[in-house]
């Protein structure tokens, strides 16, 4: 079978599990985040932000439409809080994460669970309108360049991402969560 077991696919549907993996493998890459299971805790965390400079990530699969970014998908802390509260009520937990500035890109790899073959790097256009405006589409389109890189990336960036994907597979399979198929790595290139 080409594709992970349902346990192996946990990295796709559990943002908490995915963040735990990043924390173990590349703590320097982790974005400050809070895994919230209680409404009082949610209020406390949201009140720590001066404005809407945070991201709300519901737990579970959302078809590419669940993550909401402050200043783009919601305006102001209160609107972000209301969305996070609805996520919390739906699944029992929600992740609040600092908003970062950078360019998002995707590195996918085909894997047999041990070896990987990296596909050309892509840049997604997940919003309906230009300039990242409008509702999320869940993956309306993407682009790549003939050299497999994007203008804002170096080969060393891809090498680092590939290593992280390979290390992620080792960790998933060490946890007895069998993974083969296509693993999707979502990354941000920031100034630092």
Residue ranges of predicted features:
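Short acidic active-site motifs
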Residues: 41-45
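Internal nucleotide-binding/catalytic subdomain
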Residues: 67-192
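A short, GP-enriched loop/loop-strand-helix hinge that lies immediately N-terminal to
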Residues: 1-14, 26-37
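General beta-strand structural signal in soluble alpha/beta enzymes
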Residues: 2-4, 31-35, 55-58, 95-98, ...
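Short gly/pro/ser/thr-enriched loop/turn and capping motifs at secondary-structure boundaries
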Residues: 7-12, 62-63, 126-128
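Conserved anion/nucleotide-ligand pocket segment
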Residues: 53-72
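Structural element of the ATP-grasp superfamily
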Residues: 18, 22-23
């Amino acid at each position: 079978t080409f594709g992970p077991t349902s346990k192996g696919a946990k990295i796709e549907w559990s943002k908490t599990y995915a963040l735990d993996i990043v924390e173990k493998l590349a703590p320097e890459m982790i974005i400050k985040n809070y895994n919230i299971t209680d409404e009082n805790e949610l209020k406390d965390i949201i009140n720590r932000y001066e404005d809407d400079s945070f991201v709300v990530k519901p737990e579970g699969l959302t078809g590419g439409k669940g993550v909401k970014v402050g200043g783009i998908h919601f305006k102001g802390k209160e609107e972000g809080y209301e969305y996070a509260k609805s996520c919390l009520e739906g699944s029992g937990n929600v992740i609040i994460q600092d908003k970062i500035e950078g360019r998002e890109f995707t590195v996918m790899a085909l894997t047999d669970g041990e070896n990987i073959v990296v596909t050309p790097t892509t840049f997604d256009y997940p919003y309906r309108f230009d300039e990242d405006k409008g509702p999320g589409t869940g993956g309306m389109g993407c682009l790549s360049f003939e050299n497999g890189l994007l203008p804002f990336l170096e080969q060393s960036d891809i090498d680092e991402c590939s290593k992280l994907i390979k290390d992620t597979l080792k960790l998933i399979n060490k946890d007895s969560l069998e993974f083969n198929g296509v693993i999707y790595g979502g990354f941000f290139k920031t100034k630092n």
